[in-house]
């Protein structure tokens, strides 16, 4: 019997597990020879629950998938419904959606960078990341009433318009945020210990990306400039000017650098959205005069038909024509997609959710084999997985 070979249980309560992940690691001394990921500990049957809810009632379930950036998931659900209905959202609503999707991207990347750096021993950056993330949570709350589970997007637009004061505060935050990123990068990016722990660790080449079905930063970190916002533009992304940051080596370090650069690009997109809203002026944020949107409060006080419409919208919901479609968004963690099958009723026949973290976690065995035990948490951190969406 070789006493150098043994099996180790990692998680599901481990602080570096980023949720309820259990991994069974086979080790040869300090070297990892096999990783067996056990998932399902956060399974809530979301896809089945959606079949029993109206399209509007299904919306809050998407906030609870990737709860690090909730509105990005709502976006995919709305796009799928709108695709089947054949409707186009008002321009101002489209701009607000893009702006809050980018706020969600920064929220997710701040959390990932802060915890990922902490996993390899740096304790200061996470406090700076959370300080900035807290301000973004306040912007979520001021738009929707909730810091986390917003349920702000709607099929046909967004729930309500943003007050001008909130837009001004977002612009002010965007002006100071790049300085905070410089502060984090000054401590981390060229740090000798951080580079030793991440350079040439968890390398993926372009062939592996295609084989495993990776998306998001996992693709761009290896040099492929694949971003749905650029390659398959939705909403008003085709009008916006932004770069797609890419890495060269496909290792942990390149993925960290890509996320830092993406936050800078997201700030540029948010500022462009604010300029577009200022140029276009006030406008509707929800499809007016359709079965998708509730009537105005003033109309409900004077019209019995408006009151009935309001009641039926929130009890029975609206009917979606029979058909099927796939709608995807470039979420912070990769391509988040919804394959929606409608049977002509007020509830979906089937909704299949494509979680970007699922194929990434499958590759843990490939990524960690031959590395040391201490590198497992570093690799896991740069995958940026969240179990709300993986277990569903």
From Swiss-Prot:
Function recorded in the entry: NDH-1 shuttles electrons from NADH, via FMN and iron-sulfur (Fe-S) centers, to quinones in the respiratory chain. The immediate electron acceptor for the enzyme in this species is believed to be ubiquinone. Couples the redox reaction to proton translocation (for every two electrons transferred, four hydrogen ions are translocated across the cytoplasmic membrane), and thus conserves the redox energy in a proton gradient.
Q: Which family does it belong to?
A: Belongs to the complex I 49 kDa subunit family.
GO MF term list: NAD binding; NADH:ubiquinone reductase (non-electrogenic) activity; quinone binding
Q: What is its main location?
A: membrane
- Protein name per UniProt: NADH-quinone oxidoreductase subunit D
Q: Does the keyword Lipid metabolism apply?
A: no
Against HAMAP family, the record matches this protein to: NDH1_NuoD
Subunit record text: NDH-1 is composed of 14 different subunits. Subunits NuoB, C, D, E, F, and G constitute the peripheral sector of the complex.
Give the matching InterPro entries.
Answer: NADH_Q_OxRdtase_suD (IPR001135), NADH_UbQ_OxRdtase_49kDa_CS (IPR014029), NDH1_su_D/H (IPR022885), NiFe-Hase_large (IPR029014)
**What is the membrane topology here?**
Peripheral membrane protein
User: Reaction(s) catalyzed by this protein?
Assistant: a quinone + NADH + 5 H(+)(in) = a quinol + NAD(+) + 4 H(+)(out)
Q: Name one GO cellular component term.
A: plasma membrane
* UniProt keyword terms in alphabetical order: Cell inner membrane, Cell membrane, Membrane, NAD, Quinone, Translocase, Transport, Ubiquinone
Enumerate the Pfam families for this protein. Complex1_49kDa
Q: What is its EC number?
A: 7.1.1.-
Q: Where in the cell is it found?
A: Cell inner membrane
């Amino acid at each position: 019997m070789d006493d150098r070979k043994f099996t180790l249980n990692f998680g599901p309560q481990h602080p570096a597990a980023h949720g309820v992940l259990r991994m069974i690691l086979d080790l040869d001394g300090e070297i990892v020879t096999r990783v067996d990921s056990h998932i399902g500990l956060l399974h809530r049957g979301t896809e089945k629950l959606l079949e029993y809810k109206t399209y509007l009632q299904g919306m809050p379930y998407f906030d609870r998938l990737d709860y690090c950036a909730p509105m990005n998931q709502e976006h995919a659900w709305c796009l799928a419904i709108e695709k089947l209905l054949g409707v186009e959202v008002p321009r101002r609503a489209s701009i607000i959606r893009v702006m809050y999707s980018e706020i969600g991207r920064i929220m997710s990347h701040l959390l990932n960078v802060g915890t990922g750096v902490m996993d390899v021993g740096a304790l200061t950056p996470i406090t700076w990341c959370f300080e900035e993330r807290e301000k973004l949570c306040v912007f979520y709350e001021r738009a929707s009433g909730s810091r986390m589970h917003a349920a702000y997007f709607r099929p046909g637009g967004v729930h309500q318009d943003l007050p001008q004061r909130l837009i001004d505060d977002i612009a002010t935050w965007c002006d100071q945020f790049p300085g905070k990123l410089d502060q984090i990068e000054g401590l981390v990016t060229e740090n000798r210990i951080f580079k030793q722990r991440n350079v040439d660790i968890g390398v993926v080449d372009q062939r592996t990306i295609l084989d495993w079905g990776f998306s998001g930063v996992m693709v761009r970190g290896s040099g492929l400039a694949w971003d749905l916002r650029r390659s398959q533009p939705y909403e008003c992304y085709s009008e916006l000017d932004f770069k797609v940051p890419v890495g060269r080596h496909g290792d942990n370090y390149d993925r960290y650098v890509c996320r830092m650069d993406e936050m800078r690009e997201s700030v540029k997109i948010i500022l462009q959205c604010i300029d577009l809203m200022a140029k276009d002026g006030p406008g509707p944020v929800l499809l007016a005069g359709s079965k998708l949107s509730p009537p105005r409060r003033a109309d409900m006080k004077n019209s019995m038909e408006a009151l009935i419409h309001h009641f039926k919208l929130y009890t029975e919901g609206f009917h979606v024509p029979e058909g099927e479609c796939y709608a995807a968004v470039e979420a912070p963690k990769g391509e988040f997609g919804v394959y929606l099958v409608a049977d002509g009723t007020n509830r979906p026949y089937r909704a299949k959710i494509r979680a970007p973290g699922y194929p990434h976690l499958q590759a843990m065995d490939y990524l960690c084999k031959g590395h040391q035990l201490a590198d497992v948490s570093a690799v896991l951190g740069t995958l940026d997985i969240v179990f709300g969406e993986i277990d569903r």
